């Protein structure tokens, strides 16, 4: 979800469209040599590539979260990272109908062949937990 600290949104009207989002400071993920583009999906309008000129670029999601919490701009964050801050009203969801594309969680292991039962159970548990988290947080998307 796209999120911002309330202080960021107190200085001007909350954006109602992607065009209005250009009036706000944004936080990018990656490096300065890359173009900053958010891939956002809207149920009725489909997918768009929102190109922006970030005021800050960091190279990991924890850095993005910290920058947003400290009021440095608007950024997309995985709901599993932002939901506690949203519940406490420390972050506000911006343009909730526009959702960033889903991320992927990777688990690295040598091979499925000969996979230890404990590792198989761990992978099954993680899949179950992420699926449940998705269901629990559906209202924030």
Q: What does each model-identified segment do?
A:
Residues 28, 49-60:
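Short beta-strand-to-loop elements that line the ligand-binding cleft
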Residues 25-46:
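Secondary-structure junction motif
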Residues 19, 65-66, 120:
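Alpha-helical segments flanking ligand/cofactor-binding loops in enzyme cores
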Residues 6-7, 62, 80-81:
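Alpha-helix/helix-capping structural signal
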Residues 3-27:
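Flexible hinge/capping segments at coil-to-helix
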Residues 79-88, 98-141:
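C-terminal effector-binding regulatory domain of bacterial HTH transcription factors
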Residues 65-90:
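A ligand-binding cleft/hinge motif common to bilobed small-molecule-binding domains
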């Amino acid at each position: 979800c796209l999120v911002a600290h309330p202080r960021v949104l107190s200085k001007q009207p909350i954006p109602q469209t992607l065009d209005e989002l250009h009036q706000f400071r944004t936080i990018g993920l990656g490096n300065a040599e890359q173009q900053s583009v958010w891939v956002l999906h809207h149920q009725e309008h489909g997918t768009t590539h929102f190109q922006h000129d970030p005021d800050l670029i960091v190279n990991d999601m924890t850095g993005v979260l910290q920058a947003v919490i400290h009021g440095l701009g608007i950024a997309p964050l995985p709901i599993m990272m932002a939901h506690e801050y949203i519940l406490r009203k420390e972050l506000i969801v911006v343009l909730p109908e526009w959702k960033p594309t889903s991320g992927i969680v990777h688990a690295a292991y040598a091979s499925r062949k000969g996979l230890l039962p404990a590792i198989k159970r761990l992978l099954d548990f993680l899949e179950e937990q992420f699926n449940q988290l998705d269901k629990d947080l559906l209202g924030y998307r």
